[in-house]
Amino acid sequence: MALDICVKVAVGAPDVLGDCPFSQRVLLTLEEKKLPYKTHLINVSDKPQWFLDISPEGKVPVVKLDGKWVADSDVIVGLLEEKYPEPSLKTPPEFASVGSKIFGAFVTFLKSKDANDGSEKALVDELEALENHLKTHSGPFVAGEKITAVDLSLAPKLYHLEVALGHYKNWSVPESLTSVRNYAKALFSRESFENTKAKKEIVVAGWESKVNA
């Protein structure tokens, strides 16, 4: 039986998957575990009442597990791992926080209007930390040869970074960070990612209001 999941719809396109990286993280988990699912696309700017009834805070993603709607991608991914342990996507605890500061640094740099505020260097520092981790472990993924939950969390964030910074700042991950670039390619080329990614123009549109704020 298919699992029900509510995710963000694309702005201005009622039948197209939106650009929420946290929704994609859960979709990637479902795909990698080969679990059947049914998506319900939610307009987060005009939430239907039935959705607010099941998710009073109005946040996506939410997934129905054992008859109850569950919010928060961290919680959902943890419960999916417990309920459907095979194939395992469990990340070894010592690797769970690898790359965890990249998304915040990306958002700060993307919104920055001051080239000298240090936000670009802060992002590069976080990417260099990921580079060093990937180089000192046996890759291609954070925990080694096998993809795990930490990779599925990072993949959508690195995609947003690549698309949004490329569009708004003509910026890309430095060529010197070969392990990070290869890591992103490995993630983006997976069938699970192709099946769940937002179109580039939708990612660009999703960040427009924040860039121009």
From Swiss-Prot:
For this chain, the Swiss-Prot or TrEMBL PTM comment says: Spontaneous S-glutathionylation in the presence of oxidized glutathione (GSSG).
* InterPro entries in the cross-refs: DHAR1/2/3/4, Glutathione-S-Trfase_C-like, Glutathione-S-Trfase_C_sf, Glutathione_S-Trfase, Glutathione_S-Trfase_N, Thioredoxin-like_sf
Q: Which UniProt keywords apply?
A: Cytoplasm, Detoxification, Glutathionylation, Oxidoreductase, Stress response, Transferase
- Which parts of the sequence belong to the GST C-terminal domain? 84-213
- What Gene Ontology molecular function terms does this protein carry? glutathione binding; glutathione dehydrogenase (ascorbate) activity; glutathione transferase activity
Active site annotation, chain numbering: C20
This protein's assembly is summarised as:
Monomer.
Q: What is this protein called?
A: Glutathione S-transferase DHAR2
